[in-house]
């Protein structure tokens, strides 16, 4: 896993920002309810967060299958980087559950490609 939050916070620090003053927003994404993976994803998240994954990974009844909270992992990483929890807004909308509102790669199961876009202004 690449550390995009770490790079972004590092860049903001180089521009004079203090991590505790940075605001972050995590938009709609596949939710904990729907992001089923094999063991490689939980292992990567565990490495990325230095083992701090409590509440972010749940083993499913199927052997070798897990549910992973990507938005929760991203929020956890931002907190590790020094952002204040109250400065992190997290959408609760799951792109898989709301596939009629958002494009979802998982929902199309390898069908037509799609994309989403976010705009950030300073």
Question: Predicted regions: what is each one?
Answer:
Residues 1-122:
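Active-site microenvironment for binding and transforming phosphate-containing groups
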């Amino acid at each position: 896993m690449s550390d995009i939050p770490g790079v972004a916070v590092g860049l903001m620090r180089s521009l004079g920002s203090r991590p505790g003053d940075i605001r972050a927003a995590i938009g709609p994404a596949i939710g904990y309810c729907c992001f089923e993976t094999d063991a490689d994803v939980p292992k990567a998240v565990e490495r990325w967060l230095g083992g701090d994954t409590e509440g972010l990974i749940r083993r499913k009844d199927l052997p070798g299958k897990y549910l992973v909270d990507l938005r929760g992992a991203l929020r956890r990483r931002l907190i590790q980087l020094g952002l204040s929890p109250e400065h992190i807004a997290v959408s609760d909308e799951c792109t898989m559950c709301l596939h009629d509102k958002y494009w979802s790669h998982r929902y199309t199961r390898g069908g037509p490609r799609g994309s989403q876009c976010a705009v950030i202004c300073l």
